[in-house]
Structure formats: C-alpha cells, structure tokens
Regions:
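Glycine-rich phosphate-binding segment of PLP-dependent enzymes
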Residues: 2-31, 41-56
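A short, flexible beta-alpha/helix-coil linker loop
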Residues: 2-3, 24-25, 122-125, 167-171
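Alpha-helix capping and helix-loop boundary segments enriched in small/acidic/polar residues
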Residues: 32, 135, 139, 172-176
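Short beta->alpha linker loops
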Residues: 32-35, 59-60
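PLP-dependent aspartate aminotransferase-fold enzymes
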Residues: 42-161, 180
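Conserved PLP phosphate-binding loop immediately N-terminal to the Schiff-base lysine helix
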Residues: 164-180
C-alpha cells in the first residue's frame, strides 16, 4: 500500500490538533454547523477572491473530488472531465475513474463515463523529450500545454465540464510541474 501525506508524518502539532478536535467533537455530518467549520469559513473568506462566499465541506479528498465533478457537470451542463495520467484523486468510484495511474485499470471498463486522460509534464519519463533532456523548461512546458490543447480540441471544448489537476502529483512520485504549466 502507498500513501501520500503532504503534511508529513508524526508532526506533534498535527497530532495535538487531532486530539483536541476528537475531545471537542469527534464527528460531524457534512451538513452540520461546527466551530471548526465556522473558523475555516472565516479564513477562506480572508484568502479567497471576493465573491467566493459559499463552501462545501466534505469528508475527505475523494469525496471532495466526486462533489467537484458533480458540481462542474451540473453547473456547465457538460459531461467530460479531463485528468492527467499519473494523477491520484481517491479510491471511490468517481475518484478512481479520474485517477490517471494503473490503479484504475482493474475497474475498467466499469469506470465512470466521460473521463479523458492526458499526459503530464514529467521530465523523468517525458513522452515528448526522451531523447532531448536538455530542452528548456519553457519549451518543455509549452509542448505539454500544446498536448492538452490538442486533447481539448479533439474531445470538443463544448463537451468538457472540468479539468481536474493536482498542483503537485503526490503518490505517483511527487511530480512538480515546470514553471508556467499552472497559472
């Protein structure tokens, strides 16, 4: 089994926060109002752009991704979701469907329809530049952005509800995209 914990392992501050929360309120259903959610909502309103005033609290990452897909499809009326290969978005039905690593293969062809994967800009295993490791970051990045643009055109821009991207791929190698890949 593999896992990725972006906050580290054994951090005493995290452990203490878990203990404190368990002593105050060990469980809350997604729709329940709690002090922790109120504090998080206040913090989000301080750091997010103006106008983003509603938040959907979920139980975890896979649940958040599933809800994001439902919201994107419902809001746009479009169906397709694009996601990178080597990504990991969770193990629930929808989340494993958008996951781009081989863990999803055992569930195919029963995965959620409408998912399209595209290549990620990973220098170590670059599809486009295996024989040219000295290519500039700018050109390397642009080739992968061009690839994504081509996928969008082939799939039909008017059919795409969302593009789901990890800012840094975690469980599949801590893959940091090159500068310029993400805005």
């Amino acid at each position: 089994m593999t896992m990725c914990v972006s906050i580290g392992h054994g951090d005493q501050r995290v452990i203490q926060a878990i203990i404190d929360q368990a002593q105050e309120l060990p469980y809350a259903a997604p729709g329940m109002a709690t002090r922790a959610r109120a504090m998080l909502g206040k913090k989000l309103s301080e750091i997010l752009p103006a106008g983003l005033t509603r938040y959907l609290y979920t139980l975890g990452g896979a649940d958040a991704n599933e809800n994001a897909i439902k919201l994107a499809r419902g809001y746009t009326g479009k169906f397709k979701v694009l996601s990178r290969y080597r990504s990991y978005h969770g193990a629930t039905f929808g989340a494993i469907s958008v996951t781009g690593d081989p863990r999803r293969v055992v569930w195919e062809p029963a995965v959620m329809p409408g998912v399209v994967h595209f290549l990620d800009p990973y220098r170590y295993r670059s599809t486009f530049h295996r024989n040219n490791p000295d290519i500039s970051d700018e050109e390397f990045c642009q080739d992968y952005l061009n690839h994504l643009e081509e996928i969008i055109q082939y799939e039909g821009p008017d059919t795409i509800a969302a593009i789901l991207v990890e800012s840094v791929t975690g469980t599949n190698g801590v893959i940091v995209p090159p500068d310029g890949y993400l805005p």
